[in-house]
UniProtKB/Swiss-Prot annotation:
Native source species: Danio rerio (Zebrafish)
Intracellular or extracellular location(s): Cell membrane; Cytoplasm, Cytosol
Gene: kctd7
Single GO biological process annotation from the record: membrane hyperpolarization
Domain named BTB: residues: 56-144
Sorted UniProt keywords: Cell membrane, Cytoplasm, Membrane
Cellular component terms (Gene Ontology): cytosol; plasma membrane
Protein name: BTB/POZ domain-containing protein KCTD7
Length: 292
């Protein structure tokens, strides 16, 4: 910063030019930086590992917790152990608590597992599992995945993996139902959905002309029965013990998980004529999707 001051009484008029030259020379000199001692001290502090007290006060999304440092460091490969390793800066709230910007509703369950291996109650398992994924607590994830309802979900998913377009079909159900309800300005929409386990159609009219088992049919025979039922969405076929009613339960449950109310009932079979006396006997279900 350049400071200008009035000439003193002792300066002579003849010195005005020399004074101006001197001022210009001073103006051209580069400013000398002044060391910021506080900034230098702050940088040195960040370079050194942060030290923590034995008892740690926490603020997790506005919910307060207190635990031992050793509890947070119990498993090395976790987010909490890394946070409190001293290698990272952790912000504090106005009262000095270490702040974690995460909903603290289930953080107590996380601490209970870190303290003594305690698992949450069944109705909290899914939510705690999500938190365990966020904090990367592998041992807790393994324990929860062997607990209901996550164990049942793994078995259910093994069945759904047999239907490669299950998720896409579920999205199609939602989109069609939404579009129809909006077009009709209606509270609900109805869809026709075909759910069949066996690919081979049957007929009540005569003795089957072809082999009834799919793996015994020739390729030419199979092509005679290829067709698309006149429905909105079709699921099947699959090879598993789980039957049509199991898949219907999965569809309704997954829609409910998204907050969508769905009722279904069988309204008959496709009954489309294929060849000779053969008609498609795949069951057709009417789904009623209620939006409000």
């Amino acid at each position: 910063m350049v400071v200008f001051s009035a000439a003193s009484d002792s300066e002579k008029p003849g010195d005005a030019m020399s004074g101006a030259d001197k001022g210009e020379e001073e103006y051209r000199k580069p400013a000398i930086p002044v060391a910021n001692l506080n900034l230098a001290k702050s940088l040195r502090t960040l370079d050194a590992p942060e030290e923590f007290p034995e008892v740690i006060p926490l603020n997790v999304g506005g919910t307060y917790f207190t635990t031992r440092l050793s509890t947070l460091r119990r498993y090395e490969d976790t987010m909490l152990a890394a946070m409190f390793s001293g290698r990272h800066h952790i912000p504090r709230d106005a009262e000095g608590r270490y702040f974690i910007d995460r909903d603290g509703t289930y953080f107590g369950d996380i601490l209970n597992f870190l303290r003594e291996g305690e698992l949450p109650q069944r109705d909290r398992v899914r939510a705690v599992h999500r938190e365990a994924q966020y904090y990367a607590i592998g041992p807790l994830l393994e324990n929860l995945e062997d607990t209901q309802p996550l164990t049942g979900e793994k078995v259910r998913q093994a069945f759904l993996d047999l239907l490669p377009y299950y998720k896409e079909n579920l999205e199609r159900i939602v989109e069609i139902a939404k579009l129809r309800a909006m077009q009709r300005k209606a509270r609900f929409a109805k869809l026709k959905i075909c759910v069949y386990k066996e690919e081979m159609p049957i007929t009540p009219y005569e003795r089957p002309l072809f082999n009834s088992l799919r793996f015994e049919r020739s390729e030419s025979e199979a092509k005679l029965f290829e067709h698309h039922c006149e429905v909105d969405v079709s699921f099947g076929p699959w090879e598993a013990v789980a039957d049509v009613y199991d898949l219907l339960h999965c569809i309704v449950s997954d829609l409910a998980e998204r907050g969508i109310s769905a009722d279904q009932q069988c309204i008959g079979v496709c009954d489309k004529h294929l060849i000779n006396h053969y008609y498609c006997k795949r069951p057709i279900y009417e789904f009623k999707i209620t939006w409000w």
